[in-house]
């Protein structure tokens, strides 16, 4: 078995994987340090059945397209396929209240490729907790939101890194005896070491090291 960190294990997924993120955030908030659902939602019975009644703080980073025609940004109380589900504003407000967050910083990423699929970030925090709730919205559809202005995979990694507890100590202790299994790029494809690229080094003890090798 992999020797996963007891304080720095994270979960991310898109669409149905995003719904799984929220389910685990409700049912296993003490197992995972933070969650990053992409184009996900919560079904109403997930709240009315009180599976999110735990007071355990939960760090959440949702990315969602305002033009998503599969999992509508505003939710759908009349969906006949999966069943009614909540809108993103309702979900984010739930987690903000859950974590007792009081501060909000809003920022707009430069639209570098002029495609008007502008990404806006909403970051909620508080001085009394290390947990945060982030929301990135973009004018695209049911996808990761990689529109050329933002690399969502890197933003998720930055979020997880910021939410990490004692990360540097954990990495230092484990890399001394771990064996490298493979190297992958940000899309999960196997890769050889190359310069000026973000790569992830995966070790046999379950740890992952992020590297950028400059010329």
Question: What are the language-model segments listed below?
Answer:
Residues 104, 162-190:
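Residue-level detector of functionally pivotal "anchor" positions at catalytic/ligand-binding pockets or at interdomain
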Residues 60-63, 86, 96-167:
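C-terminal catalytic histidine-bearing segment of alpha/beta-hydrolase fold enzymes
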Residues 30-42, 58-59:
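A conserved short beta-strand
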Residues 66-69, 76, 139-141:
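Acidic beta-to-alpha connecting loop that harbors the catalytic carboxylate
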Residues 1-16, 26-31:
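Gly/Ser-rich "nucleophile elbow"/oxyanion-hole loop immediately N-terminal to the catalytic nucleophile
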Residues 198-215:
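C-terminal tail/sorting-segment detector
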Residues 20-24:
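Hydrolases whose catalytic domains are alpha/beta-hydrolase-1, hotdog thioesterase
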